[in-house]
């Protein structure tokens, strides 16, 4: 049975799309890499086609290392501090992905100071029916 709701951790899927398709494989007419855009949209199309949800929400990280979490676990995502939060080639692709989702009517939600999984967790008590959560995160 298909889930009524499909909740996606958009930020983690965006990173997977970026690292899953080499930079330079797909470029916009101006030469800007769009590998993450292509990969994300391909994943989304496959998920919707396979799962056939009645509702879809894409949650985003508005803070990839929230202060409240670092206060509890000082080492939270410290490896990212050393290598940088987001690769330079991915940064301009993020707003393109969210804009495309908005343009096609997909709800994109984020909350200042929180990660996508926090947004997803806050939605669960408000949802009736079955839910499937899709994320690439392992934490």
Identify the role of each PLM range:
Residues 2-134:
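Noncatalytic, basic helical substrate-engagement surface that gates or grips nucleic-acid strands
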